[in-house]
Every structure is written in C-alpha cells, then in structure tokens.
C-alpha cells in the first residue's frame, strides 16, 4: 500500500525571497530526503546554488537534511510551497550593474579628458552628462534644465562666490593653479539659500552693533569747542536792547482745564446736602470739644481764629498776597541782572536818580516797614498754628 504512494510524484513550488527569479515548479518523490532535494535544486535551479548554501523553509519550519519529504509535506495539499534561501558567496552579476558600470566608466573618461584639456566648461560637462544619461520623458528634461538654471543663479548670487572666483584667478603661493574649478558644489540649492539668509542676517546685526557703538562717540565729537577770545581793537557794537516784559504776572497757582480754560471748582458750586452735613458735623464736634473742655474765653478765641483763617483762605486779606508778589518780583530782578547791564546810559542815570529818591523815602517809611513786618510775622504764626489744628481732607483728584 505504501509503495505506490512513495512512487507517485509530488509538485514543489520553489520561491525565492529576493524575488530575483520566478517561482520554479519541481517534481520529486516522497521518499526523497531534504539533502537529495537540495542536490537536485543545485542542478535545475537557474542560479545553480550549492547544496551546502541552501536553506529550505516549509510552513515556517527549517527543513533539516536527514528528514524525508513524506514526514514533512502535508498530504492534503496539491502544491507545496517551499522557500529557498541561499547564502551565496559569489552572487551573479546582474545586467543592470554592468550597464551602470559602463556608463560610470564613460563619464569618468569624459571627465578625465576635460581635466587634461584644461578648456572644458560646465556647459560641456552638462552636455556630456545629458548625452550619457538620456531623459526618459521630455518633461524631465525641462525640469532638469530649470533646476540647473536656478542652481547657477544661486551659485553666482551667493556671498562667497567671489572667493571661488578669486581662488581660481589668483591661487595661493606654493600651489599649482587648478585647471578648472569644480562645477558643482557640495550644497544643494536650498542649503545655498539658507546660507545666504544667514549671512544677510549676520551682516545686519553687525551693522547695527557698529552703528550703536559709533553713535556716542559722534555725539561727543559734535560738541562745540570754545574758542579763545581775541581782543580786537574796535569793540563790537552794542546789541539791540530787548523790550521790557510788560506782560502782567499770572497767578502760578491757577488750575487749567483740559479744554483750555481755568478750572471751575465744581465742588464749591455743586455741593450737595451730604457734603454740607459732613462739614457742619466736623465743625460742631471741634467746637463742642473746645466748649466742654475749656473756658468760655478760649472758646471765643478759637472761634475768632477759625473765622480769620476762613476769611484769609477766601481772599479777604489781599494785602499780604500783594506783599508776597512784590517780594517775588524783587527776587526775580535780583536773579536776572543782565537786563539792567544791557540798558542804555540814560536809563542807568534815571535809575540812579530813583535810587536817591528811595534813600530819602526810606528814612521816613522805615518805621512803617518794620511795623508791617512784625504784623506779618505774627499773622503767619497764628494762622500756621491754628491751621495745623484743623484736620485736612483727602486731596482732590486732578481733572
């Protein structure tokens, strides 16, 4: 029963993992061993692999040499797929590799001939390359031509292109001048654009730093140097006298509105009943404290002092304000004596006459000035003392 089964052939489909060869169909018998199958493959397989370099894999298992095919193959399958893996020590040379070697040899021969001639140009090299490697499609030739033009523009516009030109024209001493400079650089067009942007940015930063370092020195040098005064024989003519400032003095404490006029104190005009109640309550508390914790005479004195302070703040005593403005004008005249020095001789004589008259009047009015100074000092002391007793409200916000 087993002998007919052993004699019937089975079909094996040999598959190569690298897909270099097509699937090979081989007929064999079940009583063959794996070693005998390998020896048969070394004769009929296209690559003629050696038996010791073959590895057979069936259903994910490596087949050993001593196994029989009847013990390994499944009987219900009509075709048995076997994978052949060869560890070839001398792989066969493919026709594509030989073609590429020939083309590389042709390109190297053309390049060496151009170097020996010394008159080859990048255009001729590109023509040789294009003739060696023909374009499969016309669209690729147009794209290649556009890429080469863009590359040439980038090479010539690169900031370091002048270095290559200078090196080609004037080589360093001790070195022979090269016949031709390399037509192609190691950088791609995108890298060349990136280098160009980086160079422009570094140059811009350097120019800004240089300008910032030179600006203070230029400012210092621009300061005028005082020239020595040269005594001339004829004195310069007198400059025209400036007209006297006849403009009336303005109140320095006036508040200006944002629209261009004096600020109207709206708090005094539009004060509601709550503000008046708050003011009256503060005054009543102060007066009650003085009335209950002191005598009647002190209460009257405090009332009178408060009334005087209120009248002074309301502007009922303009004499003291006029004296303060007069002192301010006198101080301004002392600070600016240049106006007096620039006057004419006639005006100087007029001022001297006025000074003599003032000396005569000073003797008569000395007592009045002294008495007025004592009264002003006493008044300022009293007002300062009593105003310090009255608490001040919060500062008003500026309009």
UniProtKB/Swiss-Prot annotation:
All copies of the Ubiquitin-like domain together span 10-89
UniProt cross-references to SMART domains, sorted A to Z: UBQ
Keywords assigned by UniProt, alphabetized: Membrane, Transmembrane, Transmembrane helix, Unfolded protein response
Q: Which domain of life is it from?
A: Eukaryota
The primary location reported for this protein is membrane
Q: Where is the composition biased (Low complexity)?
A: 107-124
Q: How does it sit in the membrane?
A: Single-pass membrane protein
Coiled-coil region(s) at which residues?
none
Membrane as a keyword of this entry, yes or no, is yes
The portions of this protein that span the membrane are 299-319
Q: Where are the annotated segments for Disordered? A: 88-144, 211-250
Q: Which GO terms describe its cellular component?
A: membrane
Q: What is this protein called?
A: Homocysteine-responsive endoplasmic reticulum-resident ubiquitin-like domain member 2 protein
Report the source organism: Xenopus tropicalis
Q: What is the lineage of its organism?
A: Eukaryota, Metazoa, Chordata, Craniata, Vertebrata
- The gene from which this protein is expressed is herpud2
């Amino acid at each position: 029963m087993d002998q007919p089964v052993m004699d019937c052939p089975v079909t094996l489909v040999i598959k190569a993992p690298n897909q270099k060869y097509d699937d090979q169909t081989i007929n064999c018998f079940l009583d063959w061993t794996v070693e005998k199958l390998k020896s048969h493959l070394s004769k009929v397989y296209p690559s003629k692999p050696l038996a010791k370099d073959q590895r057979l894999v069936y259903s994910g298992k490596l087949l050993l040499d001593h196994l029989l095919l009847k013990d390994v193959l499944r009987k219900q399958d009509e075709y048995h797929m076997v994978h052949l893996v060869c560890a070839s020590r001398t792989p066969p040379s493919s026709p594509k590799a030989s073609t590429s070697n020939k083309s590389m040899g042709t390109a190297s021969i053309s390049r060496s001939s151009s170097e020996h001639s010394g008159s080859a140009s990048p255009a001729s090299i590109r023509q040789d390359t294009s003739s060696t490697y023909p374009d499969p499609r016309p669209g690729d030739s147009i794209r290649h031509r556009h890429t080469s033009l863009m590359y040439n523009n980038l090479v010539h516009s690169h900031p370091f292109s002048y270095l290559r030109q200078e090196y080609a024209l004037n080589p360093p001493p001790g070195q022979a001048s090269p016949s031709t400079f390399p037509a192609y650089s190691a950088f791609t067009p995108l890298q060349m654009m990136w280098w160009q942007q980086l160079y422009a940015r570094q140059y811009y930063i350097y120019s800004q730093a240089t300008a910032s370092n030179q600006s203070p020195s230029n400012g210092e040098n621009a300061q005028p140097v005082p020239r020595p005064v040269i005594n001339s024989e004829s004195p310069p003519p007198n400059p025209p006298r400036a007209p006297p400032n006849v403009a009336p003095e303005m109140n320095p404490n006036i508040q200006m509105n944002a629209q261009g006029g004096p600020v109207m104190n709206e708090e005094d005009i539009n004060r509601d009943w709550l503000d008046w109640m708050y003011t009256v309550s503060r005054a009543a508390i102060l007066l009650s404290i003085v009335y209950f914790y002191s005598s009647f005479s002190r209460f009257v004195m405090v009332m009178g002092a408060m009334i005087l302070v209120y009248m002074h703040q309301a502007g009922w005593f303009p004499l003291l304000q006029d004296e303060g403005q007069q002192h301010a004008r006198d101080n301004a005249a002392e600070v600016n004596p240049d106006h007096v020095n620039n006057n004419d001789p006639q005006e100087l004589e007029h001022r001297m006459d006025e000074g003599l008259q003032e000396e005569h009047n000073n003797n008569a009015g000395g007592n009045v000035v002294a008495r007025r100074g004592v009264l002003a000092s006493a008044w300022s002391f009293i007002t300062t003392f009593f105003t310090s007793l009255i608490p001040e409200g919060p500062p008003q916000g500026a309009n």
